[in-house]
Amino acid sequence: MEEKLKKAKIIFVVGGPGSGKGTQCEKIVQKYGYTHLSTGDLLRAEVSSGSERGKKLSAIMEKGELVPLDTVLDMLRDAMLAKVDSSNGFLIDGYPREVKQGEEFEQKIGQPTLLLYVDAGAETMTQRLLKRGETSGRVDDNEETIKKRLETYYNATEPVISFYDKRGIVRKVNAEGTVDTVFSEVCTYLDSLK
């Protein structure tokens, strides 16, 4: 099983809040049959399952602390192993957030085939998030919080992008356009992996 993971197509998907990466991931799943794994979703699912690990996570998150890297990696690996036979590849969404996370992922799970960088300007992301905030009811979709989230994102992501850029596996997608325009660019990169 572990060997199969090492051979699997693994795509890190990186993009700021409001860049549209979630939407692009959904479209990739539909067209290519990849499995979309978001560390945030995995954590939330584990917490609501009421498992032993979930209870520990809940306590950590309630204090506003970061979940230990080992725990996140174990959850990712478990989720990937569960799907490795039925999936054409994996989209790892919102991970790695720092270089160390990427290195640990490679040691414990496998090498990324590609890093898809869904890149939209700060202005575009802000407008999209404000618009989403009107309907989503998400507390973190207001202008002040958005500014902070974008800052955090840029500071964390730049070193990750340059780390993988040195290996030549970063594919930058211009996410300013419509969903379909962006997706056709995404497809050119994924089609080249076959």
Curated annotation (Swiss-Prot):
Species of provenance: Mus musculus (Mouse)
Assigned keywords, A-Z: Acetylation, ATP-binding, Cytoplasm, Kinase, Nucleotide-binding, Phosphoprotein, Transferase
Function: Catalyzes the reversible transfer of the terminal phosphate group between ATP and AMP. Also displays broad nucleoside diphosphate kinase activity. Plays an important role in cellular energy homeostasis and in adenine nucleotide metabolism. Also catalyzes at a very low rate the synthesis of thiamine triphosphate (ThTP) from thiamine diphosphate (ThDP) and ADP.
Major place of residence: cytoplasm
GO molecular function: adenylate kinase activity; ATP binding; deoxyadenylate kinase activity; nucleoside diphosphate kinase activity
UniProt family annotation: Belongs to the adenylate kinase family. AK1 subfamily.
Modified sites of kind Phosphoserine: S38
PANTHER family: NUCLEOTIDE KINASE
Catalysis performed (reactions): a ribonucleoside 5'-phosphate + ATP = a ribonucleoside 5'-diphosphate + ADP; AMP + ATP = 2 ADP; dAMP + ATP = dADP + ADP; dATP + AMP = dADP + ADP
Enzyme Commission designation: 2.7.4.3, 2.7.4.4, 2.7.4.6
Protein name: Adenylate kinase isoenzyme 1
Annotated residues for binding of AMP: T39, R44, E65, L66, V67, G94, Y95, P96, R97, Q101, R138, R149
Cofactor: Mg(2+)
Residue numbers spanned by region LID: 131-141
GO cellular component, one term: outer dense fiber
Gene this chain is encoded by: Ak1
Domains (record comment): Consists of three domains, a large central CORE domain and two small peripheral domains, NMPbind and LID, which undergo movements during catalysis. The LID domain closes over the site of phosphoryl transfer upon ATP binding. Assembling and dissambling the active center during each catalytic cycle provides an effective means to prevent ATP hydrolysis.
Example GO biological process: AMP metabolic process
